[in-house]
Design a protein with these regions (language model features):
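Short, acidic loop-to-helix structural element flanking the phosphoryl-transfer center
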Residues: 68-103, 107
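Short, charged, surface-exposed secondary-structure boundary motifs
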Residues: 126-133, 191-198, 207-211
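Glycine-rich phosphate-binding loop signature in dinucleotide/nucleotide-binding domains
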Residues: 2, 91-93, 151-160, 211-212
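Surface-exposed amphipathic alpha-helices with a cationic face
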Residues: 82-90, 144-145, 149-156, 176
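Active-site neighborhood of HAD-like aspartate-dependent phosphohydrolases
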Residues: 1-54
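Substrate-recognition "cap/lid" segment bordering the active-site pocket of phosphatases
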Residues: 107-162
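Acidic, Mg2+-coordinating phosphoryl-transfer loop and its flanking beta/alpha structural elements
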Residues: 95, 99-100, 159-199
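Short, acidic/turn-prone active-site loops that include or flank metal/cofactor-
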Residues: 120-126, 186-190, 202-204
Length: 212
């Protein structure tokens, strides 16, 4: 059995129980509008990356420090998140947080939880201020998995040495890539592609433990 060397962790619905892009859009009074666009995307009214790009561009002029301050008020962490991160960090297991959310948001959680690597949307930044994003700044619809593969390649870690944790059909590419897959509070039938189903992130600890 391959030793687990990396955990691939989805963000919204997995590490956190709120859509954090909606939350930070509240900094500029656009939380409700972001929520509406996101609902329309899930209803099939927006194709490709257009909805995500629109929501990110609400944040033009917002700073990293504003985002950090907003998330320090409330982090919206899923039950068991801190326990899981403490467990993997103590054992030197690489963690890769992957999301369509923006790098400034993921950086806040990286600092909060000691996450090793982050993969997310990369808006143009002027100093610590968000200047916007375009479709050209994404490698493609599978940009999250592309980023994961690059990090693992640099670390010399093979797919069968990884565990992916996610909650929705958007995580299926990571589930199919990783050696082991865990669905947390699954939606959209993604549990059919998972090896395990959990409802608290700390429940992933014994699964990882038996693979060390």
């Amino acid at each position: 059995m391959a030793k687990v060397k990396a955990v691939l962790l989805d963000f919204d619905g997995t590490l956190v129980h709120r859509d954090i892009l909606d939350v930070v859009c509240g900094i500029v009074g656009k939380e409700a509008e972001s929520e509406r666009i996101n609902r329309e995307f899930h209803d099939g009214k927006h194709a490709g990356l257009s909805a995500l790009i629109t929501r990110i561009n609400f944040l033009k002029g917002v700073t990293q420090s504003q985002i950090d301050a907003k998330l320090q008020q409330e982090a919206f962490l899923m039950p068991g998140a801190r326990e899981l991160m403490a467990y993997v960090n103590e054992r030197g297991i690489i963690t890769i947080l992957n999301s369509g959310n923006i790098r400034p948001v993921l950086l806040a959680y990286q600092k909060m939880l000691g996450i090793t690597h982050i993969v997310g949307s990369e808006p143009t930044m002027h100093g610590g201020t968000i200047a916007g994003i375009t479709e050209a700044q994404f490698t493609g619809p599978n940009f999250k998995l592309d980023g994961i593969k690059l990090i693992l390649e640099q670390a010399g870690t093979q797919p069968h040495e990884t565990i992916a944790i996610g909650d929705s059909p958007a995580d299926r590419p990571a589930f199919e890539f990783a050696g082991t897959s865990i669905a947390i509070n699954p939606k959209g039938g993604v549990e059919a592609f998972a090896d395990y189903v959990i409802h608290d992130l700390s429940e992933a600890i014994p699964i990882i433990d038996q693979k060390l």
